[in-house]
Amino acid sequence: KNKRRIVKDVMIVNVVAIQKGSKYPNRYIIMSGDIDSRVSDPNDFRSDSPGANDNASGMAGTIEAARVLSKYTFENSIIYVGLSGEEQGLFGGRGLAKHAKEKGWEIIGIMNNDMIGNIKGVDGIIDNRTFRIFSEPTPITETAKQRNARRFYGGEVDGISRQLARFIHKTTKKYMPEMNPKMIYRLDRFGRGGHHRPFNDEGFAGIRIMEMHENYTQQHQDIRNEDRIEYGDKLKFVNFDYAKKLTAVNAINLASIAWAPPAPKNVKIGGAVKPAVSFKWDSVEGAKGYKIYWRDTTSPTWDHFTYVENTTEFSLEGIVVDNFFFGIASVGENGHESIVSFPSGLIQN
């Protein structure tokens, strides 16, 4: 249907590798790169288009993560995928997301890696430690009832994709403290798109991991020299050490999520006009305990927690529900914890 960037009939083919989980084979965490590239004219399929950073870097990272993590056994399944047709309209992602929905796959989330190899920005800044995590605030698939509830109980920045972004931020700071993950409160860059979006459109969690500083002279450009500027997405401009770091960011987060128990479901919260906050949630198979998190309403990260075991309800005494946001994560016997679940229901007084 897209006649603007699809000028003739073509097959859209993704390359997919699935590492099946030992306990939850139908629960998937996904890492993706893209296997297409482009030059200045998106319909020019004849000119040399190396796409070294956009997006051979993300694809190489995905393959390397698969090489390393395939040596281990995880409770949840991991999908490593090269998505096609990104530059022409996110076709590969649309196809896989639709397939996952139709087959009833339980998608924990997708980590879309699109450009993870550039450290020198068009603004002249050089930075080999900072990277961005883009995420939408709430699912586009939420119902009018869910949207209305947020007006009264909060959650405007606490959708499933934002929780995945917070998990990646926290895990990176824990295992790679030299890195500087930066959460960006946008679906993607201003007016632009990436292959996590089709998964968001189907109601799945999805984020984009990418370099902090883009260089537009090396992105979507015909290879040429003009006004003393070398244009083109060439291999010489990719910083391999930086791409390695962001690949490691993906690997530690894939492993942490794949080793963790499922996130709590049916999390309910109460505490209106009380000096305490109450919680109830469904028991999670394989969880040793649970972390109850809270944060200031203006804080981007979960900053405080208390740990509980052998219960599916708890009250935080001396805390007023109005002044904080709350969430609950499952903790496995191995110490790995799930992504935080934001409350979706109320405990009636």
Task: Set out the residue ranges of the language-model regions.
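Soluble metallo-hydrolase cores and metallopeptidase-like ectodomains found primarily
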Residues: 1-48, 67
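Short helix-loop-beta-strand segments that form the rim/entrance of peptidase-like active sites
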Residues: 67-91
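Metal-dependent peptidase/peptidase-like ectodomains
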Residues: 83-194
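Active-site-adjacent mobile loop/cap segments within catalytic or ligand-binding domains
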Residues: 116-136, 183-259
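Conserved aromatic anchor
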Residues: 275-286
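Short beta-strand segments within Ig-like beta-sandwich modules, predominantly Fibronectin type-III
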Residues: 304-311
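Beta-strand-rich modules
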Residues: 316-337
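Extracellular fibronectin type III
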Residues: 333-349
